[in-house]
């Protein structure tokens, strides 16, 4: 949302514990609400209402583009392993093509908090979190072969050069 100039860094939402839209109520996990929250406090407190509003302003198709940049809906190892699942991050076109239905705004809200049609793998979420923590810098996992020490207690491996350096 920041990247698309939909919200500013100072954007705040008043969380009352729910958001009502078109006769539907979307609840925050904190029933009494978080009060007024900005992006930082919304992340820290996991305020659903903040992300509902941010998603509403962004729209599901732009949300999908951003999610894809973080690896959601894409295989981590491309086609290296046939067992690996790509997950799913929906869009208006996806729903029309796969379910024959139009997109509903409420679906955008719940997609914005990772619910609804969203499907991710634990590794995708781990890498997305690492990318956020590293200022947008992607960290790719490194696969290692079975190189064990004689005692078979520890795996020997080399650190990948794309890991953050200690300063």
Predicted feature descriptions by range:
Residues 2-167:
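Beta-lactam-recognizing serine transpeptidase/beta-lactamase-like catalytic domain environment
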